[in-house]
Amino acid sequence: MTTVKVKENEPFEIAMRRFKRSIEKTGLLTELRAREFYEKPTAVRKRKHAAAVKRTYKRLRSQMLPPKLY
């Protein structure tokens, strides 16, 4: 459970911003969205495999950059 203690004379907007930042850092919203609906195990494997392929191609593209001419 993420908690944020509001400091004395602290505006609500700043406390809300700190709360949102802490939620984002813990990854709570992404996990909540992932668990909102049931996902079949085959769909999970397929999604993870596609992400791994995408990461691999991204890494290869960055390694094969042509030399800069300037």
UniProtKB/Swiss-Prot annotation:
GO terms for cellular component: ribonucleoprotein complex; ribosome. HAMAP family: Ribosomal_bS21. The lineage of its organism: Bacteria, Pseudomonadati, Pseudomonadota, Betaproteobacteria, Nitrosomonadales. NCBIfam families: S21p (TIGR00030). GO terms for biological process: translation. Pfam families: Ribosomal_S21. It comes from Nitrosomonas europaea (strain ATCC 19718 / CIP 103999 / KCTC 2705 / NBRC 14298). Keywords: Ribonucleoprotein, Ribosomal protein. InterPro entries: Ribosomal_bS21, Ribosomal_bS21_sf. Belongs to the bacterial ribosomal protein bS21 family. The gene is rpsU. One of its GO terms (molecular function) is structural constituent of ribosome. This is Small ribosomal subunit protein bS21.
